[in-house]
């Protein structure tokens, strides 16, 4: 029994130390959804429709290499609206420290869009830029704002999805 007591005590302390404190977890909110539509509100990201951007690619402009593809997913809502879901993959460079103690990082992505104009022809590739700023603190890592072609298209609103719509 004398040998069992220290083992039970050690086991009990181990269980107590494994408890988690929800406040100590950092919330990650880095999914960004990009919608591209025409002036009438029609989706322009349908991968097979004439008049849409059937070819889309992302290139990391802050990477060490000239060609550094960035992964994204083209997704579709139930109403057949297509959008791009970007989660992560581009280089993040430190920008500055904020007065509240958080840190700001940025990614710069070249967005190449190929528009299908007939069954056999495409328009010349459109090259756009997307600059994503992130805020990092002990409690949260989140997309804070997004510039598309140097125009502010997204500013973070707490508990809202990170979504922007571009009209072309």
Please place each PLM-identified region on the residue numbering.
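Tryptophan-paired
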Residues: 52-118
